[in-house]
A protein has these predicted regions:
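Symmetry-related core transmembrane helices of the 12-TM Major Facilitator Superfamily/SLC fold
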Residues: 1-3, 191
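Transmembrane helices with small-residue packing motifs
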Residues: 3-5, 55-56
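Juxtamembrane intracellular "pre-TM" segments in multi-pass secondary transporters
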Residues: 6-40
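C-terminal transmembrane bundle of multi-pass solute transporters/carriers
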Residues: 23, 30, 44, 56-191
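Hydrophobic alpha-helical transmembrane segments of multi-pass membrane transport/permease proteins
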Residues: 40-47
């Protein structure tokens, strides 16, 4: 790491308000259809598909009958899958197009989440949540890499700010929207 030379000087314009910077990010995103699709995709995915993260304690207790250490291991299975999914994008899937990986990971994520959402078997829940985590981070890594490779240095920070709002900012909003639905019809149908 000590031999790496990087230019950390600020890029873009300085002295702009945060709203102006957000506006510049939106303008840059709209200028490239791929960038716009990536931002919309991660936003919709985060809003609608990551509700299960907030519901894992409920699923563990009510559907699987586990708590304590078993719940910790369940969440660790998700995290381990996510870590392997991210690493796999730079290793064994590095030659596969990010577009194919994004599309494929959404289907794998949906199937694994469906299994996780309906199962009452811990033997099925652990591998399902592991695969869910892996597919989730294959998608996030593929989309993030695509985004960063397509935007220029002078607007990358502004566009990545939009990415963070879509990726991390909409997950709790999705949880708030899903909460009353889960109370009304149950966790499995919502997932």
């Amino acid at each position: 790491m000590a031999t790496v030379h990087a230019d950390f000087s600020p890029k873009g314009h300085s002295g702009e308000s945060p709203w102006q910077q957000i506006k510049e990010g939106v303008v840059a995103a709209k200028a490239d259809p791929v960038v716009l699709r990536v931002l919309v995709m991660i936003s919709v995915f985060s809003l609608c598909s990551l509700v299960f993260i907030y519901q894992m304690p409920l699923i563990a207790e009510e559907r699987l009958g586990i708590d304590g250490l078993a719940y910790t291991l369940l969440f660790a299975a998700f995290a381990f899958g996510a870590a392997l999914g991210a690493i796999s994008m730079g290793t064994m899937f590095s030659e596969v197009s990010r577009s194919r990986m994004s599309t494929g990971s959404i289907y794998v994520f949906a199937a694994a989440l469906a299994v996780f959402g309906v199962t009452t078997s811990t033997w099925l829940a652990f591998p399902a949540v592991f695969v869910t985590g892996g597919a989730y981070f294959v998608l996030v890594t593929a989309l993030s890499t695509t985004l960063q490779m397509r935007v220029s240095d002078d607007v990358r920070g502004r566009v990545m700010g939009l990415w963070m709002m879509g990726w991390a900012g909409l997950v709790p909003v999705g949880g708030l929207i899903a909460g009353p639905l889960i109370d009304a019809i149950g966790v499995a149908p919502v997932l």
